[in-house]
Amino acid sequence: MNKELLLGVNIDHIATIRQARGTRYPDPVQAAMDAEEAGADGITLHMREDLRHIQARDVRLIKQVLQTRMNLELAVTEAMLDFAEEISPEHSCLVPEKREELTTEGGLDILTHRNVVEKAVRRLQLMGSEVSLFIDPDKEQIRAAVDVGAPVIELHTGCYADATSEEKQHYELQRIKEAAEFAASLNLVVNAGHGLHYHNVKPIAAIRELNELNIGHAIIARALFCGLKEAVRHMRQLMQEARLYVND
C-alpha cells in the first residue's frame, strides 16, 4: 500500500495581495485556517528579509491558531534565525534568497556554504525544529545535506515546472526521481516543491519516495475563481489520484 503524500499549502501570496495595497486584508491567518479545514496537512510561510509578503505578525498569529503544523521558510541569516528562535516553528526550511528575485530561483548551495548552513541547522534543531534544506535535485548537494545533519530535504522542482518542451520536462522529472531515490536510500525524508500546479503535479506526486509537496502560487491563483477551500481540495485530489496508481 502506498503511503499518503502530504500537502503543505504555502499562503505567501495571500499576503502579496494584501501588501500590494497596504491594507489589512486579505488575512493570511484566515487563509491558513481555511486551508487546514480543506485538508492541508500543514501551512508553509516564507518570511523574506525584505518582508515583501509575509510579516512577522502573520507568523506569530498563525503559529497560535494552527491545528496542524507550520513550516517556516527562512534565509540563513542572523536576523531570520533570531526570529525563528522566538517563534520555535515545528518545521523550518532553509532557503536561498536574493532581494532582486521574483521568487526563489534555485536550491541552497550547501557545498559552497557548508559551515554557515551546518551552524544554522544545529541552531534550529536546538529550538526543537525539524530542519529541511531546499536544494536542487543533485546528489552532491544531497550528500552535503546529510553531512550537515539535516534530516529532511525539499527538492527544488522549478526546472521541471519551467521546462518548455516535453523532452526537457522528462529530463528534469528523471533528475527529481533519481534524487528522491538516492536521498531516501540515505534515510532522508524527501519533500518537493516550487512551480507545481494543477497540470504538472501528478508526475511528481507519483514519485513514491516523496513525503510532502509544498504548493502555493497555483493554489492561491485557482482560489480567485473557485475559493481557497475548493482549490486545496482539488490539489489534494490530484495528488491522491497520482499515488493511487503507483505500483508497490
UniProtKB/Swiss-Prot annotation:
GO molecular function: pyridoxine 5'-phosphate synthase activity
Catalyzed reaction equations: 3-amino-2-oxopropyl phosphate + 1-deoxy-D-xylulose 5-phosphate = pyridoxine 5'-phosphate + phosphate + 2 H2O + H(+)
Keyword tags: Cytoplasm, Pyridoxine biosynthesis, Transferase
Enzyme class: transferase
InterPro entries: Aldolase_TIM, PyrdxlP_synth_PdxJ, Pyridoxine-5'_phos_synth
Main location: cytoplasm
GO BP, sorted A to Z: pyridoxine biosynthetic process
Annotated binding of 3-amino-2-oxopropyl phosphate, by residue: 10, 21, 195, 216-217
Subcellular location: Cytoplasm
Sites annotated Transition state stabilizer: 154
Assigned GO CC terms: cytosol
Pathway where it operates: Cofactor biosynthesis; pyridoxine 5'-phosphate biosynthesis; pyridoxine 5'-phosphate from D-erythrose 4-phosphate: step 5/5
Annotated residues for binding of 1-deoxy-D-xylulose 5-phosphate: 12-13, 48, 53, 103
Gene3D superfamilies: Aldolase class I
CDD domains the record matches: PNPsynthase (cd00003)
Catalytic residues (UniProt): 46 (proton acceptor), 73 (proton acceptor), 194 (proton donor)
EC number assigned by the record: 2.6.99.2
Function recorded in the entry: Catalyzes the complicated ring closure reaction between the two acyclic compounds 1-deoxy-D-xylulose-5-phosphate (DXP) and 3-amino-2-oxopropyl phosphate (1-amino-acetone-3-phosphate or AAP) to form pyridoxine 5'-phosphate (PNP) and inorganic phosphate.
Assembly and oligomerization: Homooctamer; tetramer of dimers.
HAMAP family to which the protein is assigned, alphabetical: PdxJ
Database matches in NCBIfam families: pdxJ (TIGR00559), PRK05265.1-1 (NF003623), PRK05265.1-3 (NF003625), PRK05265.1-5 (NF003627)
Family the UniProt entry places it in: Belongs to the PNP synthase family.
Protein name from the UniProt record: Pyridoxine 5'-phosphate synthase
Protein source organism: Legionella pneumophila (strain Lens)
Lineage, highest ranks first: Bacteria, Pseudomonadati, Pseudomonadota, Gammaproteobacteria, Legionellales
